[in-house]
Amino acid sequence: MRQLRMAALGAAVVALAVSACSLGGGSQASKGTIASQLVLAGPPECPERPFCLEGLTGTYGITFKDFKATDAGGPITIEALENGDAQVGLLFTSDPAIAAKGFVLLEDDKQLQLADNIIPVVREDVLAGNPVIEEALNGVIAKLCQAALTDLNKQVTVDGKAAAEVAAAWIAAEGLSFSGGSGSVTVGSTNFYEQEIIGEVFAQVLEGAGIDVERKFQLGAREVVFPALESGEIDILAEYAATALEYVNNKAGEASTDPAATSDKLRERLADKGLTALDFAAATDQNGFVVTKATADRYGLAKLSDLAKPAP
């Protein structure tokens, strides 16, 4: 499923040296920082990528004791964190392992990563005929924080619950209730489980508002779902702001680390297709750096800039 976001994550995660390489010995600026005591685990390409180690050094002034080549947000990275071979690991920010393993996702407080915030993409004619759709979907988005998205993913992919069950429980817990809708819409998704889960949340909220909803999930890649949106085969899609923008603009490089600016540019690019993007969520699915709770507690880590503080 991860390849669905490879266009955005390729810029954020693409490759470096295949073996572990020492990164901490030469920089006097990094001596004595928390990072200089720790090993980073990530994909082999991480050291040379602007949204991975290169960016951590340039944006945060972080140099690690060592780098351990593992995988792109997968089980090898998770294992390295759990067995102590690494203390910091690159995962995706909504990876269910974060909730399942109790990892601490370090806040990207200097906005290193491109803004892949969750955002609904909707046909404009559907919104014009049913204003409650915008109200309801933006209501969902307002509640969708990072912890909520990660937990939804965990419940489906780790705990084995049905997406419909998980969506219904979350909607009830958040008190999401709307009315005044009519007619019918179709909610679609790519073949990525997370987009299907969010799509199910969208569908149930709209049904609660009085709208008949058809679900067309697991349609395929963006090369399938965007033509489906434009043709009217589907009306609503949960997307990622930066990734969606770079898809519709043919990789023009307009996405930035600013979610508001990226979302505005996405709306601009969608306008001539009869589509628009609604509000963006606080929740993202992009590169993220995690530590175990024990490491976070030991060093007082909550955000990436904490790694540049003097070691205790």
Residue ranges and their predicted role:
Residues F226-A283:
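N-terminal segment of the mature folded domain
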Residues A15-A20:
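C-terminal motif of bacterial Sec signal peptides marking the signal peptidase cleavage site
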